[in-house]
Swiss-Prot record:
Domain of life assignment: Archaea
Quaternary data: Homodimer.
Single GO term (MF): GTP binding
Catalytic class of the enzyme: transferase
Organism lineage string: Archaea, Methanobacteriati, Methanobacteriota, Archaeoglobi, Archaeoglobales
Pfam families for the chain: CofC
Biological processes annotated in GO: F420-0 metabolic process
Protein name: 2-phospho-L-lactate guanylyltransferase
Length: 206
């Protein structure tokens, strides 16, 4: 199985800029990518596509400055192909095993906000259209092409890290992940007084 992981290295996760510095966001993005790679390694040949040079041990990195849709559609005819987003740190081998075992010409794993977090295409001819409710667009596209589409439903694949509420999910469910350990290291924790909420400890300079 070919596995494509798109990755944005420059100014990643801008919606977290109110609680993370640019350097912290870059490191979080890098570690989430490594978490995804760790989960996906047993299932096939991984290729990371990025608009700039990137050093990731053990996987092929391709530099492509095109937009996401153009980048992914360039390789869609290499089906069977899986496209997995790089900001899904809660993924595990168990979750991906179930994903890859799901029958269908097209398997779509939705995000919590209507996006497509993972996509598995087993037939040539399919084209992606990310952003703006892509989950529904991909299901409709498969239907129009006469392809059998299946929805893969998993909490752990639905959590893509974009804002503070997503970080809360990572801190509650991501123990053992590289990204989780990084957030703990820079002072993040979860308060369980009444409604769970994200907290950050401030380290005083000596």
């Amino acid at each position: 199985m070919r596995i494509l992981i798109p990755f944005k290295a420059n100014n990643p996760k801008s919606r977290l800029s109110s609680i993370l510095s640019e350097e912290e966001r870059k490191e979080l993005a890098r570690l989430m990518l490594l978490d995804v790679i760790d989960a996906a390694k047993p299932f096939g040949e991984i290729k990371v596509v990025c608009p700039s040079e990137l050093d990731v041990e053990g996987v092929e990195v391709v530099v492509d400055t095109s937009d996401l849709n153009t980048t992914v559609n360039k390789v869609m005819d290499e089906a069977p192909l899986a496209v997995i987003m790089s900001d899904l740190p809660l993924l595990s081998e168990e979750v991906l095993k179930r994903f890859f075992e799901t029958e269908g010409d097209v398997v779509v794993a939705p995000g919590r906000k209507g996006g497509t977090n993972m996509l598995l295409v087993r037939k040539r001819g399919f084209r992606v259209s990310y952003h703006f409710g892509s989950f529904f667009k991909h299901l409709e596209m498969a239907r129009k092409m006469g392809m059998k589409a299946k929805i893969f439903d998993s909490f752990y694949s639905s959590v893509d890290i974009d804002d503070e509420s997503d970080l809360l999910e990572l801190m509650m469910h991501g123990s053992g992940k590289k990204s989780y350990e990084f957030l703990r290291k820079i002072g993040f924790s979860v308060s369980f007084e009444e409604t769970p909420r994200l907290e950050r400890r401030v380290f005083m300079q000596p």
